[in-house]
Amino acid sequence: MADTTKVDVLVVGSGPAGSTAAMYAAKGGASVMMLERRSEVGTPVRCGEYMPSNGEIVKMFPNLTDEGSLFDIPSKLVCRETLGIKLVDPKEKITLLDMPGYTIDRDLFDQYLAKCAVEEGADLVTRCAFDSIDGGVAKTTEGDIEYKVIIGADGPGSRVAQSLGLNRNRNPYPAVSAQVKGDFEPYLYMFFGDIAPGAYSWIIPKDGRANVGVGCSPRFSEGKVTDYFDKFAEKRGFSEHTRVGGKYVPSEGPVSKTVSGNGMLIGDSAGQVISVNGGGIPLAMIAGRIGGTVAAANIKSSSPLEDYEVQWRRIMEKPLKTAAFNKKLADMFAFRSEWSTRFCMNVLGKRRLNKLIRCQSLFP
């Protein structure tokens, strides 16, 4: 890369949010550069690798339109279709929720989205870390990049957010995962209790293997999240697994503002994550499509970047704020002990647990 590169839209981060934004910005006619600080897109894998079906996504976000084109991924990227979710309380009582979905290999999925962005005309630069902004110029480890619009898709600790003067996520919680071999039912398992204080541990089935992991709230946990993972793996008989990878997950809903000047935040950097379960891939892609489209329109016709704020909030704000409120209720009442977790799950019952997982108000 030259000492100073000029580009219409600079996207920082090549996850689902960044790649989708880069794809739609390029599709809209803008010159686009996408930065990835690692040597390869999608690695290491640090998430649960689960996607709800298109129908379930629309149930959660009823204002979403044209979801088919956004989530139309090749069948070869689908590891396994799942039939539902089994919620397991501290005494192993199971509540089955009918919620179809599918699992993916996150590295291959991310690489596919990045390839789509490149095919639309975006430039992908790996081994390039964003540092700061100086008057419309991004300072990176590979030189300066002059841009017209910058999109921060660089996760909960977003440097882009900091550089734009926007709030970053408060109190994200750690989560770790690994892969294990075996034959598993076509259901996602979520385990609650002391095995994962303030959050849950999971088994997500794939093809002859599973993604297993643990998330913990620092407010309730008394040790490292990796220690809880080891206990969970031992309890479930996972004596052999791949290397454990981790990340931080936003847990308090979207940040108050996602546009500032000629910059915007999308995905985890904007807190666009479902607080009650940590899910974020579909939301990242929804926000990425909006952000990339709005950025291209800004370049082409000077339409305001604030259109992004308006559009994503119309689709996602209410469900995300409802999920964040439900998470606060869980922190206040359910996660105080294993007894309170069991009690609250029994009181809520299957109907309200269905609402909880789908970002809906629990009452009435």
Q: Which residues make up each language-model segment?
A:
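C-terminal helical "tail/cap" subdomain of flavin- and related membrane-associated enzymes
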Residues: 293-364
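Glycine-rich FAD pyrophosphate-binding loop
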Residues: 14, 26-46
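Short beta-strand to alpha-helix junction loop
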Residues: 95-116, 217-224
